[in-house]
Design a protein with these regions (language model features):
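C-terminal capping/gating helix-and-loop segments adjacent to ligand/active sites or protein-protein/ligand interfaces
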Residues: 643, 702-769, 773
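Hinge/lid segment of periplasmic solute-binding proteins
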Residues: 443-498, 515, 627-634
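Mature extracytoplasmic/periplasmic domains
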Residues: 229, 319, 332-333, 345, ...
């Protein structure tokens, strides 16, 4: 057996290059008190793989995995073509072939024991060869360990032959014994199945009786075969049911996964070959779960749910075994986690963030007093995004004294209430249980900041030489984000959201009133509409008018101003739009698309979401000689534009290590981390300025509604227009609480239903909102 070189099983300290040492509590993920035991990871690098791990399974205390390895020189034959791209044939009409010796990466199967030793090639398996002269690929789509150390491998072949114009696809089931001898093979291809279709097998499992189950996702069925490949029967799902996967329970029974009919979550069904139907649902996983699989350790299934690694015994409640990130493991890198018979959590991962390579990680339960303690800072969030996850991992690996422990409240979401986690987090903060660091997505920061729960970050920015004080940042954005001169959160990217219109009609200076918008519309051709097709009154109110609702509330002083006339104007603006839009009567051809409507004067304004510069010059070209002005939303102060962002990072006023917390959250302002701009325009001034400099004069290629390729140039005038609007924008969207939004929407419905005037609705909102806002102080 070909032994693969591996490193020793090491507990790597923070001072080593990978810096992957950590401890994570075996109690509920995110618990702040030190638990009696923590998981300590031991890393084994898997050498000899040409790439990362692709598939992983477990059975009988061993792990099976697939990865690519470098093959020796292979003689490949290819169809030869002439200079015009036509296939060459000989005098007999046969294809002329050419030969080439190449080295390729090919799929291979490996096994290793759960203790981390004995990584070895499963020598019996080598990828199937395509027919001679064929061009295509062979994919190792699934593997399943069998009783006694055997293996079932499922390959998908896709290829074409020179003498044929048809593209062939088939699936090949191959069965091996523990010594690697191939004992059976069966091909499923066109003509081998009912209806002549080639099945699309995408998952495989095996039961205690030695039966192998193949999931045909396209055909909506699960096919059972015996150890020789002979068909035993099939179970079909109904037409409305989509098969997601298979797994084998601890008792050796096979279960199928399907989406919950009511949406969200995964249902688990026993497979009943006798009735040829899926059995009743035996358990339902949360909509947060990433599919179940055979995970070992006496559990029926394991799965990931957000940052949590979970295990399930059918008939009992799922167990959250650990949080990947609190073990300093990037959940995005985990191929699969397993549980050993001794209770250790194992995972196979591909190290994308470090030096590369694949690893087996054993997370060993260890008494907490045997692990070097660190001071912990808590970070709370409702979903952990990729950038923050990566920053937490980097901080924890490099800092010898402090670590950040993540509490992801999305774990409390349910199929009945997707917002349960956010509600719990918001309630806890309101009650005074504030984390050291907060990811602010969805959090009513206006009311919490007014209560003094979070720290002003301007002093930290001014004292940080890395950024050059306030001048080192895009100040208009952060000034708009500030409350009464205090900045409570920072972020690495933002979007400029505005309306664009023809300069010849709306003028050249951004910012206008509702009356000015109506006057401009009167100048447009008869029948011209304000926005693109499909907008209704309620949609305009929810998506456009709501952008500046936060400006009607002063949370600190408990003052509302919905009754000043501006809010009533906002409601009356929606009268320009229909109650309902009749999509059945619409023309969806390019001639009725937004671009054609703007060019022909049938649409006055275009919504702009400027989070990059790539398409701006194309958008401007739509208005032709009339020119384009970023006029903004009516009634919004300043430029009429608003800033939006996906969420920020804040520090609690109660945090005892604010400087350490700042060292962490300020990663989002660092120039090196803003090259990708966090999904928007960068907030670091140097990166922001460079973005504009680099794009001036650049040719941009776009595609029109009718598919035509259009090339435009981003000019200095375009750059100046965007920057001028940014410099005069003073509003950030979405700055209101969910409860306040509900009050506004409830009262506004009376206006949309024709039961109340705009002024009546404004007065009612003023009364209810004032009571609510003062209750929150």
């Amino acid at each position: 057996m070909n032994k693969i070189t591996r490193t020793g099983s090491l507990v790597l300290s923070l001072t080593l290059a990978l810096g992957l040492f950590s401890g994570c509590g075996s109690a509920e993920p995110g618990s702040t008190p030190g638990p009696d035991k923590v998981y300590v990871p031991q890393y084994t690098k898997l050498e000899g793989l040409a790439g990362g791990i692709n598939l992983a399974e477990t059975a009988e205390g061993r792990l099976f995995l697939t990865a690519e390895v470098e093959s020796g020189p292979v003689l490949k034959k290819y169809q030869k073509y002439d200079e015009n791209g036509e296939p060459l044939t000989d005098a007999e009409g046969k294809p002329v072939m050419e030969e080439e010796s190449v080295t390729e990466n090919v799929p291979a199967v490996f096994t290793l024991d759960a203790a981390g030793g004995g990584l070895a090639r499963f020598e019996g398996y080598s990828v199937s060869a395509l027919p001679e002269g064929a061009e295509g690929s062979v994919e190792l789509a699934a593997i399943r360990p069998l009783a006694g150390g055997g293996l079932a491998a499922l390959e998908r072949l896709s290829y074409s032959l020179p003498q044929e114009e048809v593209y062939r696809e088939s699936c090949l089931l191959r069965i091996f014994d523990a010594k690697g001898a191939e004992t059976a093979k069966r091909e499923f291809g066109p003509g081998s199945e009912e209806g002549g279709e080639s099945p699309s097998f995408t998952a495989m499992a095996a039961d205690a009786q030695g039966r192998i189950f193949l999931m045909d996702q396209t055909g909506g069925r699960v096919l059972a075969v015996d150890g020789s490949g002979a068909e035993l029967g099939a179970v079909r799902a109904d037409e409305q049911t989509y098969l997601q996967g298979l797994f084998q329970s601890a008792a050796g029974e096979v279960y199928a996964m399907t989406p919950k009919p009511e949406g969200g979550g995964i249902d688990l069904h026993a497979i009943d070959l006798g009735s040829k139907k899926l059995g009743q649902t035996v358990h339902s996983l949360s909509y947060e779960a990433y599919g179940a699989y055979s995970g070992g350790g006496g559990y029926d299934a394991c799965y990931n749910e957000g940052e949590s690694f979970c295990a399930l015994r059918l008939g009992a409640q799922p167990e959250r075994l650990l949080s990947w990130i609190n073990c300093d493991i990037n959940s995005s890198s985990v191929v699969r986690g397993f549980v050993s018979e001794g209770g250790e959590v194992l995972c196979l991962l591909n190290d994308y963030d470090g030096g590369g390579g694949a690893y087996l990680v054993r997370l060993v339960p260890t008494p907490a007093d045997q692990v070097k303690p660190k001071t912990t800072l808590s970070l709370a969030c409702n979903y952990l995004d990729y950038d923050v996850r990566r920053a937490v991992l980097d901080f924890n690996r490099k800092n010898a004294e402090f670590r950040i422990e993540v509490r992801d409240y999305s774990q409390y979401n349910t199929d009945e209430d997707y917002g349960a986690g956010l509600t719990k987090l918001t309630t806890e903060i309101g009650a005074g249980s504030v984390p050291d660091i907060l990811l602010t997505n969805g959090i009513p920061m206006e009311s919490f900041a007014a209560k003094g729960l979070f720290t002003d970050l301007w002093p930290f920015i001014e004292a940080d030489s890395r950024f050059g004080g306030r001048e080192g940042l895009v100040q208009p954005f952060f000034n708009a984000l500030s409350r009464e001169g205090k900045l409570y959160e920072i972020t690495g990217g933002f979007t400029l959201q505005t309306l664009a219109g023809p300069s010849s009609v709306v003028g050249t200076q951004p910012g206008w009133s509702f009356d000015q918008l109506r006057a401009a519309l009167d100048k447009m051709p008869q029948g011209c509409e304000v926005f693109s097709r499909g907008w209704t009154r309620r949609e305009v109110f929810a998506n456009v008018c709501s952008l500046s609702l936060g400006s009607f509330v002063d949370w600190k002083n408990g003052v509302c101003r919905f009754d000043t006339g501006e809010f009533a104007d906002l409601l009356r603006f929606t009268e320009l739009f229909p109650e309902e839009y009749k999509w059945d009567d619409d023309d969806f051809s390019p001639k009725n698309g937004e671009e054609a409507r703007i060019r022909e004067g049938r649409q006055m304004l275009r919504q702009m979401y400027i989070n990059s510069l790539y398409s701006y010059s194309y958008d401007a070209s739509l208005y032709g000689k009339a020119g384009m002005t970023l006029i903004g939303y009516p009634g919004v102060p300043g430029s009429g534009a608003v800033f939006s962002y996906s969420g920020g990072l804040a520090i609690s006023e109660a945090c005892k290590n604010k400087n350490v917390a700042w060292d962490f959250i300020s990663y989002c302002l660092d120039p090196d981390n803003q090259q990708d701009a966090f999904g928007g325009l960068p907030t670091n001034k140097a990166v922001f300025d460079k973005l504009f400099r680099d794009n001036i004069g650049e040719k941009m290629t776009s595609y029109s509604d009718d598919g035509a390729e259009v090339e435009t140039v981003f000019t200095e005038d375009y750059a100046r227009s965007i920057q001028d609007v940014i410099n005069s924008t003073v509003t950030v969207s979405g700055r209101t609480s969910g409860t306040l939004s509900s009050i506004i929407n409830e009262e506004a419905e009376g206006f949309f239903a024709g039961q109340k005037s705009a002024d009546e609705v404004a007065r009612n909102i003023q009364n209810r909102a004032s009571i609510y806002v003062n209750e929150q102080r």
